[in-house]
A protein has these predicted regions:
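Sequence-structural signature of mature extracellular/luminal beta-sheet repeat domains
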Residues: 3-306
């Protein structure tokens, strides 16, 4: 993808003003080492949807309200990859190293090709418009999984307000062969999602605004083409579990009001990576030596031990 516009010249990151990571778990302490959080960029309006783009060695993320998709490069430069977006939120990279996006405004899943434009993949389920696709992942088989809460319908700064045509907030699977979109489960304001390393467990955060459902990360077993054994996996101690990622050993790193919370495979809380502002999402690079965190106007970096 050709560079559209450079908004930050190459240069070094600067330390973020926040406490160091806190943990009593020896394994997590070893993974964190003496790392301190670094600020890579802080001129976005609302940072979300980080994804590592290995082909370009670039961290891609969204400035949702600013209607841009940005790219941080390893020399410190930041480029606008997509401009005047339809309130893009979640991003992912498929096996062909193409960028895939959730668009609040178009109420759709799109894919960016070499011309730098986002092309529609799916925007309807059983003839009705999707709500406001929020976050997505690409599975090993090439299927695209995404959440579809109504946030972009309710908040003008995050999308295009309009009537909700569907009677549910779904978690969907778009088959890799171009088959019909599948609604795998309905949840209360589903938000972030990720698979376990072996893709036998799907994690989805629920972030309801009011009502009787509490914010939590929910787990499902994925087998035989369906989700089974729904259960509460974890609750963050501060704020909401928005976006999250899972490392190679199966630990889940979740955004929260205080930073990034880390949970083991049983949902036990291991520790916290504090951030200066509420964290919205996080992801690793390919080697999982770097954790990228979005929140507010900012993209942060934490360099990890193997």
């Amino acid at each position: 993808m050709d560079r559209h516009c450079r908004v930050r010249a190459p240069g070094a990151a600067r330390p973020a003003e926040c406490p160091p990571p806190a943990t009593r778990h020896a394994g997590l302490a070893a993974r964190l080492g003496n790392a301190r959080l670094l600020t890579l960029y802080d001129q976005a309006t609302w940072s979300e949807g980080p994804a590592w783009w290995e082909a370009q060695r670039t961290l891609v993320w969204s400035d949702v309200v600013g209607r841009r998709v940005l790219g941080w490069r390893e020399d410190g430069a930041v480029d606008v990859l997509l401009d005047a977006t339809a309130f893009t939120n979640g991003n992912a990279v498929d096996a062909q190293q193409r960028l895939v996006h959730c668009e609040h405004g178009r109420r759709a899943i799109t894919r960016s090709d070499v011309d730098g434009r986002a092309h529609l993949l799916v925007g309807r389920f059983e003839g009705k418009r999707l709500n406001s696709p929020n976050d997505l992942i690409v599975a090993h088989d090439g299927a695209i999984w995404f959440t579809d809460p109504p946030f972009g319908l309710l908040k003008p700064s995050q999308g295009c307000p309009g009537p909700q045509e569907l009677d549910h907030h779904g978690v969907y699977r778009l088959p890799p062969d171009g088959g019909a979109l599948q609604c795998m489960v309905g949840l209360d304001h589903p938000n972030g999602l990720a698979f376990s390393p072996d893709e036998r467990v799907l994690y989805v955060s629920q972030t309801p605004e009011g009502g009787t459902t509490s914010p939590e990360i929910t787990a499902f077993d994925w087998r035989d083409g369906a989700l089974h054994n729904r259960r509460r996996f974890a609750v963050v101690p501060d704020g909401l579990p928005d976006g999250f990622c899972v490392d190679r050993q199966g630990w889940l790193w979740s955004s929260s009001g205080a930073g990034v919370c880390v949970f083991d495979t049983d949902g036990q809380y291991l520790g916290l990576v504090p951030t200066p502002a509420t964290a919205s999402n996080c992801t690793f690079d390919l080697e999982q030596r770097r954790l990228f965190i979005t929140g507010g106007s900012t993209l942060w970096l934490l360099e990890l031990q193997q």
